[in-house]
């Protein structure tokens, strides 16, 4: 963990570089696991990979300790860069003073745990300290940058209206089929991955985990989420694990109150998503009602029942149009409820690439970069945002200015720009939206030129 007098960069030099120039504690101690599909990864940046049913039936710790992760651990300790961690390498390659997410991921664990990881034999199974799980993909939203792998509303869209057409750069097929492999079991069927998780939870996870974070889909729509919450209520003396919920907060206050009432006496953090304002937010995050979302955010802050509330911003091309105003909103909430009551992260979207910020032409990237620079200069001295938050903003500014390709896969700008327009033209028809009435004149001028 970072010492109180250290900067993020100081911490990296003192601890991480001492272990290895490419070490990341998340590869040992963190996992995101999609139990509906039997897929796992060490954080939200590397592509997920499969875990077989046979593996988890024999050893439930294989939900995390896969051969691929063990090979990545070996590479990191040898100073090599695992290919799946390309997001962090691209941030760091912008300059030696740039802090990537692997620093923040590692910082979540004690110095002792990180040094122990370096000494643990590669073939050993490691106990998790932080875990994010998704039980299924049930979700009432169908955000533009999401897909059927993570949303049943997206599944319905593809089933009813068919695949999106003529997207030449979507090599991963985000929008062409219903991704049946991402929900292998119906809700009434026994899911061996869910059973393996609960077996591991009962055996040792409830003791080794610092934080359990439930995501989705929308996790408050899953019965398994409420089963876990009930476990916490009746076993408060058995676990020090803190509970966190990822939620789009797209529901009325009765469900918010159910969550608060069900977790009374439990350390709870809520992570919600948004990155733009008003109609632009409703356009990007289809299913969101702006007023409802903001009402729920304010209600949670006023309740003073949470450890903290976190807003995760998925930085895509469209949200840049009103991101400074969204940051103003967050600053206002911090002034009202205290700067530590609310945190924000700016997570740069890379897939689908044709929706990412680098699809924009140079003049628009510079325009949005300059607006963010202006916002940063105006607000940096008010002390409303922590070092982590300001670093996220500064690296986004640098990313818009310096980085030209979002990942190591092919990126031909003109083709991605054509797909940008093709997708949103179809999106408007399918979702009853209107790009031209939603975004700013400078964005629209470029859009019409494609």
Give the ranges of each region predicted by the language model.
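Cysteine/selenocysteine-centered motifs that mediate thiol-based redox chemistry or coordinate metal-sulfur cofactors
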Residues: 2-5, 59-114, 126
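A Trp-anchored, charged/polar loop motif used as the substrate-binding/catalytic surface
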Residues: 70, 112-122, 189-203, 253
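N-terminal pre-triad scaffold of radical SAM enzymes
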Residues: 25, 29-42, 121-149, 209-213
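Detector for the c-type heme attachment site
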Residues: 89-93, 146-152
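Radical SAM enzyme [4Fe-4S]-AdoMet core and its adjacent flexible, acidic
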Residues: 1-64, 96-107, 155-158, 262-266, ...
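Core AdoMet radical
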Residues: 128-138, 149-193, 207-225, 235-255, ...
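Short metal-coordination and nucleic-acid-contact micro-motifs, chiefly zinc-binding Cys/His arrays
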Residues: 20, 81-84, 132-135, 139
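Short linear interaction motifs
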Residues: 7-22, 112-129
